[in-house]
Every structure is written in C-alpha cells, then in structure tokens.
C-alpha cells in the first residue's frame, strides 16, 4: 500500500514539474520574441519614428534614408537630411525637396510649391525664390 502511495505522489510531482516547465518555456519564448521585435523595430523602423540606417524611416516624422532622411510626413529623406512628401527635406544635401515646401540639390528651395532650384535660388511651379 505504501508503494502505491509513493508512486502516486511521484506521478503527481512529475506532472506538476512537466506543466511548470512547459509554462516556463512558453513565457521564455514570449519574452525572447518581444525582445526580438523591439530590436527589429529599433533597427528597421516602422510607422512612427523608426528604421533606416541612422535615425531612419517610417511614415510620420520618420528618419528614413541613409542619415536622418525620408518618410512621408515631416520626413528627412534623401541621402543626408533630405526628402519626403510634406515639409520634406529631400534632395542630396540639406535640400528642401519634396512636394510641398522645398527641394533642390544643396540647400535648395525647389519642389512643387514654395520651391527651390540648385543652390537656394531659382524657381519651381509656384512661389519660387
């Protein structure tokens, strides 16, 4: 009779140990996945303030591009400090660029509206200086 009780207790302990180890493994897996997602978000960006090579990427206030660049709204874009669609830096170096508010190659206004040229001079389709 004592051996049956001992076997029953050992069996119950084995089941508890098995269940707790599976729960621990699941929690560890979820934690690793969360950390991996955080690292990927930091590296490659997303929709808000992320990605690219350096301060890059995204749709809203996104860095994007190679250095400080890119995005659709208030985006840096371009190669260095440039680009975007709305209020975008654009261009190759500190260029205004984009569709609204800028463009050009070097500190140029440029673009479709309020724009630009090659070196801060010249026209666009509307209000160019």
Curated annotation (Swiss-Prot):
Family: Belongs to the DRM1/ARP family.
Signal peptide start-end: 1-25
UniProt induction comment: Down-regulated in axillary buds within 15 hours after decapitation and then up-regulated.
UniProt keyword Cytoplasm, yes or no: no
UniProt region (Disordered), positions on chain: 110-129
Keyword terms, alphabetized: Developmental protein, Signal
Source lineage: Eukaryota, Viridiplantae, Streptophyta, Embryophyta, Tracheophyta
Free-text tissue specificity from the UniProt record: Expressed in axilary buds. Detected in growing stems, leaflets and floral organs, but not in roots.
Name of the coding gene: DRM2
Name of the protein: Dormancy-associated protein 2
UniProt organism field: Pisum sativum (Garden pea)
InterPro entries registered for this protein in UniProt: GRP (IPR010800)
């Amino acid at each position: 009779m004592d051996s049956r009780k001992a076997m029953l207790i050992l069996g119950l302990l084995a089941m508890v140990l098995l269940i707790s180890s599976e729960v621990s493994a699941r929690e560890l897996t979820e934690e690793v996945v969360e950390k991996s997602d955080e690292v990927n978000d930091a590296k490659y960006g997303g929709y808000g303030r992320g990605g690219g090579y350096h301060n890059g990427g995204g749709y809203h206030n996104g860095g994007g591009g190679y250095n400080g660049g890119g995005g659709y709204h208030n985006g840096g874009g371009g190669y260095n400090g440039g680009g975007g669609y709305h209020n975008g830096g654009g261009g190759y170096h500190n260029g205004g660029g984009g569709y609204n508010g800028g463009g050009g190659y070097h500190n140029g206004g440029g673009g479709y509206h309020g724009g630009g040229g090659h070196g801060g001079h010249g026209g666009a389709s509307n209000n160019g200086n």
